[in-house]
Every structure is written in C-alpha cells, then in structure tokens.
C-alpha cells in the first residue's frame, strides 16, 4: 500500500519514509482497493472493487476499444471516490437484471390488484408490495452512486457531484414518485382499517402512480447494459447476431402489444369502479358487479382487444360518456400499435433474408429485360438456369464486402471459401502457401453451362481457369479429346507464350470455375519464378500429348533450373496431370454435354475438321476393306458421309465438313494420302453404342480370316481422288454367331440382313475387289 502511494507523491518525495507519507495516502489506498472504504477487510475490499469496475470481456472491448482503455476506465473508477459504481460493471448488470424482472412483475400485477381487488391486506400481496418498495428505494439510492453514460459526448460521468447534478435534473422525480412506500405507511401507522371510503380511494389513486415506473423501463431499454445482456445470451445459445436480434425484436413487439391490451382491459374496469358502477356503464348493464375478478378481467380484456383491433365494441356498444371516451382512446391506441406492429414486422421480415430479397428483385429485372427484347424460350430457360446455378437464390455484393475488410481477414475468408479448390488441386498442395494466398486473392468466380465454349481455339487468351466442380472437354484439331475435372486447370499456355489458344475447351456439365486474368497471372509469377517453371513444364507436356510444340516454351525450358526442389514438384504435377487425363477418359461422353444446344450424335466426328476429299477417301478405303456387305443402316454416320462425298465428288476444292473426325479415323493406317499399304492383322470395327454414337476401334482379326490384298483391278485412293467405288463385294465369309450385328438397337440405326442392303454406288463404273480389314457394326 505504501509502496504504491509513494510514487504518486512526486519525484521529490521518492526518499520519504513510509511513516512520513502525505495525508493523501489514505485516499490513494482507497483508490487502490477499487473505491471501497478502508474499514472493510482486505479480501472483501478487493472483491467489491472488482465488482464495481468494468471487466475485460467482449462487450467492454467493443465499447472502449482495447485492453488499455479498459484499464484506464478501471483507474478512473478507483480514483472517483468510495462506492462509485461503473455502469458497465458486473454488479450493475446483475442489479439491472433484477430490477427489470421486478418492474415487469409490477407492471402486470399492480394494475390487476388496484382494479379488481378490494382487500389488499392479504399476506402474499403485502409481501410482494413490501419487497418491491424495498428494491425501488435501494435503486433510488444506488442511482446517486452509479456513473451516467452521456450519449451526446460519448463519455461516462464518474464524479459524485456530476452524477448527483445530472440525476436530479432527469429521472429523480419520476423514480421518487414511483417509489413512495405506501404499504410501509399503512403497516406502520395502521390506518387502513379506519380509513373511510374517500381516503381509501385516495390510496388507490396513489397506487396508480406506480405506472410511472414504465419510464424507468424505457430508460433501461435505451442503455447498452440491456444490449450487453442480450449479447451474452446470444453467445450462450450460439446464435448469430442477426437471428438473435430479430427474435428479440419480435418478442419485444409482441410483449408490448400484450402489455398494452392488459393495461387497457384494467382501465376499462377501473373507470366504472371509481364511479361506483353507474347504471349506464358496461359492468352494470352486464350485471357483473358482484362476479369474480377472473370473469370481470376476462370481459374487460375482451372489450379492450375488440376496441384496439377495431373489430367491434365487445358485448355491446358504449352508452355512457365515460365508456364512449374510453372506447375512442382504445381505438386510437390500438390503431397506433397495429400500424407500428405491421411496420416493424415488415421491416423485420425483410431484414431476415435481405440477400434472397435482392436476388428476387434482380431476377425480376432480368425477366423484364428478356420480355423487352423478346428473347426465345430456349434462351430464357438457359438464363434462368444460369442464375440458379450462379447465385443459388442469394445475391451478395462480394467485392464490396471483401474490399471493406482488412487484408488478413480478407485472406482468411478467401482461403476458407476456396478450401475445396485447394484440397483437390496438386498445384496448390505442392506450392508455397504465400503463392496459394496470392493466387486465391486474385481469383474471380464464374459459372458455365453445358455446351458453353469456355476457351475457343485461335482466340487471344486473357484468362486461365481453375476447376472447382464440373467436367470439361479439351477439343484439339486432329488429336484425341482430353477431359478435365475437379482440381484441374487450363488456359495457361497462351498466358505463358503470349499467343493464341491452342485448343478449345467445352463445358460438358455445369462448371464452377475460378478465373485468373493475364495481368494477375504475370504479377504472381514474377514473385514466384519457381511456379512459372512448373506451369511451363505442364504446358509443354500437354502440348506434346496433342502433338504440338511451342518454341518459346522450349527455349525457356532449356534454361537452367534455379533449384532441385522445383524439379520434384514439376514431376509431381506432370504425373498427376497425366493420371487425371487418363482417369476422366473413361467417363461417359454424353453426361449432359451439348454442343450449341443440340445433343452430340456421333462424338468421334466432332473433333477436328478435315477436307471433304480426305473424309471421302477415308470412307472409301473403309468400304473397300470390308469382307461382305456393310451392315449399316442408310442413316448411319458412315453412310451419311458417303452420300456427302458423292455429292461433292469431282470438286477440286471441297469445303470443310461441318463435323470432326475422330482420332482413329484421322490417324488410322487407312488414312494414307499416297498409297494404301498392306494392313496388319487387325480388323476395323465401326461400333454403334446404345446412345447412337459411333466409335471406330482396331481389334484383332476374326477366326479363320486373314489379311487380304487389293486385286489387280484395285487401285489406291488418295485425297486428290474424291471418288467412291461403285460396288463392294466380299468373300462371303459367315459372321460369327452372337456378334453384335445380330442384335438390333432401339436407336433406329438398324442393320439389314446380308443380301438386302444395296451396295453403295458411285460415278466410277468399275468394281473394286475388297481386300484387307473387315468393318462390322457392333450394336
């Protein structure tokens, strides 16, 4: 104690002994104990001092801003004087909670007791009134020692003189009138049995003064200590702030309406009772003067609610003037409360789900926009589906929200929302966390529908994409298509080479992607050169797999590597990229995929555009290498190609065919443009799946069949000879039992029995003897 008081005396008194401490030492000692008198024991002094001071918690930190500010406020309480209570202390919080419950009880019980009970000297009634009067008087005394929050200046008055002056000017008179101990007076003087009727009515009038305690309740609702109590209950029930505040507002509104109905019902009976129930009042007309108080209260409450809700007058219309004025007053109060209730309820409902309301308003504008431009029904449906998948019924201004946050908090939110992308992407799993954060903070969320071309071959690349969910196809000219799924990325090649797109990427399902612009891409890679080398390695491997090269990437790869750890990471990324390409290759190609809004009928023909002459020669070679009549229907893709070739026969420069040939048609051994070599011991099968798609595959030769050569009259076909043979005849070898050609699919691509199919004809009159592989339709 003395050591704490010595530094406060000043630098010149640092050497003063403890017995020569200045007279201010007792005050300093009292301040050190939290403003509690020194006569109290040391442990109790410290406990009481802690209860009277603000504690460090979420609410105090939100009010004062920091731990240091809370400590300064505690020092202010210690130096303010003895028994000064801080308004944000624990003691004041619990005291206000007790007073709040007691006030609510008085606001409900006192009107009923004053109105419907004549004998008020029963023990329960006396105990309740005495207890209430005691707490109200104690609250009146404590208000002189409790700090006052000045809302205008955002400060707290703790000086005793300032507290006293301000309290006397504001709420002292109301609290004094509402705290008059009428029951104490009746008990001590014992005047209640000898009071005549006039004095008894006067005593009842004094009890009505207790209604002014509603002003104290309103004052408590305005103070932040009640809000602090609500916040603590939020943390207990693990509620969000919006939900908890909305629920509390609903209960407050409903409770206020019921309390006003309760008061109005008591007032409807109190006025006739003070007039000794005249003959024209509603109580006398209904003969309820001597009924029980429960029945009287029920009829009075029904009459009051009928007036307040403006649905009638109750059991009968008012007759006397007091009843008429009470009815008008009830209607005015009820209409006001009803309007307030509707307004608050509407605002509350709108605030509960503002994001969904914004989405609905936005979509109404979109519907009006589509109607104004008279968009077709298919386009409207695609727009509707896009909004459903993009926003999912809620709309936020995410850029504005994230822009208002601090950088660490923004990075934390982005890392949390993109945690699924990071978990499924090896590029981020093996990368520096700083690189991952730098990339994630610059990503932009996008949604694509089935059939959308995310990337178009030959266009200038300005973005690269990371796949969060969805399935996409990479369509490269003259190469097998590659499929990408969750955790993959694409579009980085043109950003690295500053060139054009080397392939097209089409969305097969609804895809949720994150895009990275070229400026952000280069800015991130400048900070992390190791990751640039990893991107270049994967890009070169992808180009190598589709049979393309890039001199810029090769030149960059020839430069020495800055470290050995990067090579290991590059190997992991390349291996995972290859494994993923092989893993998704077996997926069903028709999983919701659409091309320009139409289903793909024969997918191997929609990959790389070829010249019509080349396609004609390929089909012609396939037809000449069959061993029997072609078991394909006239509507099959091969027959359609043959017809298209016959129409364009003789043209020196045929246009591009609007379909794409599969990789095996484009690169098979029959696609030679100079001379047809002797085919190996393999058989060409054109199989038609259940969905109507045709696939060409190389299988082994059938039992007993071997490779054959062209006859003496046969000649090789090339792209410069766009003619088909007139007739194709086989060796008549029987088909294997149980082959796919014996089962007819329901898709309409039916193979007619041998001998009924007319051989395809051409402008060339001479027949060609078939030699080589056999083509059959497996259905």
Curated annotation (Swiss-Prot):
Q: Where is the composition biased (Low complexity)?
A: 7-32
User: On the Extracellular side, which residues?
Assistant: 118-123, 192-200, 274-296, 319-328
Q: How is its activity regulated?
A: Unlike HCN2 and HCN4, HCN3 is insensitive to cyclic nucleotides, such as cAMP or cGMP. This lack of sensitivity of HCN3, despite harboring a functional cyclic nucleotide-binding domain (CNBD), may be explained by its shorter C-terminal sequence, which may alter the normal autoinhibition of the channel. Inhibited by Cs(1+) and ivabradine. Phosphatidylinositol-4,5-bisphosphate (PIP(2)) shifts HCN3 activation to more depolarized potentials and accelerated activation kinetics.
Q: Which GO terms describe its biological process?
A: cellular response to cAMP; potassium ion transmembrane transport; regulation of membrane depolarization
Q: Which residues are glycosylated?
A: 290
List keywords of the entry alphabetically.
cAMP, cAMP-binding, Cell membrane, Glycoprotein, Ion channel, Ion transport, Ligand-gated ion channel, Membrane, Nucleotide-binding, Phosphoprotein, Potassium, Potassium channel, Potassium transport, Sodium, Sodium channel, Sodium transport, Transmembrane, Transmembrane helix, Transport, Voltage-gated channel
Expression (tissue specificity)? Detected in hypothalamus, amygdala, olfactory bulb, hippocampus and retina (at protein level). Highly expressed in brain and heart, in particular in ventricle, atrium and in sinoatrial node (SAN). Detected at low levels in skeletal muscle and lung. Expressed in DRG neurons.
Gene3D superfamilies named among the record's database cross-references: 1.10.287.70, Helix hairpin bin, Jelly Rolls
Ranges within the bilayer without spanning: 297-318
The record's domain comment reads:
The segment S4 is the voltage-sensor and is characterized by a series of positively charged amino acids at every third position. The ion-conducting pore region is between segment S5 and S6.
Protein name, as recorded: Potassium/sodium hyperpolarization-activated cyclic nucleotide-gated channel 3
What gene does the UniProt entry assign to this protein? Hcn3
């Amino acid at each position: 104690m003395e050591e704490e008081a010595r530094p406060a005396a000043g630098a010149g008194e640092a050497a003063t002994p403890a017995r020569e401490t200045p007279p201010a030492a007792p005050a300093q000692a009292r301040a050190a104990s939290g403003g509690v008198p020194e006569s109290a024991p040391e442990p109790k002094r410290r406990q009481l001092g802690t209860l009277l001071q603000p504690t460090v918690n979420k609410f105090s930190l939100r009010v004062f801003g920091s731990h240091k500010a809370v400590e300064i406020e505690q020092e202010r309480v210690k130096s303010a004087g003895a028994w000064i209570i801080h308004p944000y202390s624990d003691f004041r919080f619990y005291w206000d909670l007790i007073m709040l419950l007691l006030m609510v009880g008085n606001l409900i019980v006192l009107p009923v007791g004053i109105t419907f009970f004549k004998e008020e000297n029963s023990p329960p009634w006396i105990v309740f009134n005495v207890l209430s009067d005691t707490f109200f008087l104690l609250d009146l005394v404590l208000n002189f020692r409790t700090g006052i929050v000045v809302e205008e200046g955002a400060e707290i008055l703790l000086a005793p003189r300032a507290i006293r002056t301000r309290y006397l000017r504001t709420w002292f008179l109301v609290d004094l009138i509402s705290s008059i101990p009428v029951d104490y007076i009746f008990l001590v003087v014992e005047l209640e049995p000898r009071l005549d009727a006039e004095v008894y009515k006067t005593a009842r009038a004094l009890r009505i003064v207790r209604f002014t305690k509603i002003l104290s309740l309103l004052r408590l609702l305005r103070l932040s200590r009640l809000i602090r109590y609500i916040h603590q209950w939020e943390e207990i029930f693990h509620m969000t702030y919006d939900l908890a505040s909305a629920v509390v507002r609903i209960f407050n509104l409903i409770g206020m309406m019921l309390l006003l109905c309760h008061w109005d019902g008591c007032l409807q009976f109190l006025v006739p009772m003070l007039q000794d129930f005249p003959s024209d009042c509603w109580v006398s007309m209904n003969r309820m003067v001597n009924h029980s108080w429960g029945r009287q209260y029920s009829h009075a409450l029904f009459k009051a609610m009928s007036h307040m809700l403006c649905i009638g007058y109750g059991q009968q219309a008012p007759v006397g003037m007091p009843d008429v004025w009470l009815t008008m007053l009830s209607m005015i109060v009820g209409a006001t409360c009803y309007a307030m209730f509707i307004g608050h309820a509407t605002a509350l409902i709108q605030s509960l789900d503002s994001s969904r309301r914004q989405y609905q308003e936005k979509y109404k504008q979109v519907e009006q926009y589509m109607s104004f431009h008279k968009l077709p029904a298919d386009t409207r449906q695609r727009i509707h589906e896009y909004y459903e998948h993009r926003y999912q019924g809620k709309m936020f201004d995410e850029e504005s929200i994230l822009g208002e946050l601090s950088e660490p908090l923004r990075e934390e939110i982005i890392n949390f929302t993109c945690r699924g992308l990071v978990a499924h992407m090896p590029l981020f799993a093996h990368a520096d966390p700083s690189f991952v954060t730098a990339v994630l903070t610059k990503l932009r969320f996008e949604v694509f529908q089935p059939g959308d071309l995310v990337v178009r071959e030959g266009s200038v690349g300005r973005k690269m994409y990371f796949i969060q969910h969805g399935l996409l196809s990479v369509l490269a000219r003259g190469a097998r298509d590659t499929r990408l799924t969750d955790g993959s990325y694409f579009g980085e090649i043109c950003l690295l080479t500053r060139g054009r797109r080397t392939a097209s990427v089409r969305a097969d399902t609804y895809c949720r992607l994150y895009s990275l612009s070229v400026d952000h891409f280069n800015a991130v890679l400048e900070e992390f050169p190791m990751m640039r080398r990893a991107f270049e390695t994967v890009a070169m491997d992808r180009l190598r797999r589709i049979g393309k090269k890039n001199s810029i990437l090769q030149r960059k790869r020839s430069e020495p590597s800055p470290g050995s750890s990067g090579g290991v990471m590059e190997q992991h990324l390349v291996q995972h990229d290859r494994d993923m390409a092989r893993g998704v290759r077996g997926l069903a190609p028709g999983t919701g995929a659409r091309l320009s809004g139409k289903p793909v009928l024969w997918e191997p023909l929609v990959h790389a555009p070829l010249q019509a002459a080349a396609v004609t020669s390929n089909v012609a070679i396939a037809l000449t290498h069959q061993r029997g009549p072609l078991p394909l229907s006239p509507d099959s893709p091969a027959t359609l190609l043959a017809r298209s070739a016959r129409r364009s026969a003789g043209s020196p420069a045929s246009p591009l065919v609007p379909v794409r040939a599969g990789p095996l048609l484009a690169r098979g051994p029959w696609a030679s443009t100079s001379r047809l070599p002797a085919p190996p011991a393999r058989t060409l099968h054109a199989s038609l799946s259940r969905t109507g798609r045709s696939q060409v595959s190389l299988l082994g030769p059938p039992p007993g069949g071997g490779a054959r050569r062209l006859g003496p009259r046969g000649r090789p076909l090339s792209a410069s000879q766009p003619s088909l043979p007139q007739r194709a005849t086989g060796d008549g070898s029987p088909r294997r039992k149980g082959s796919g050609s014996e089962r007819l699919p329901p898709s309409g691509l039916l193979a007619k029995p041998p001998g009924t199919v007319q051989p395809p004809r051409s402008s060339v009159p001479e027949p060609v003897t078939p030699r080589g592989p056999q083509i059959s339709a497996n259905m």
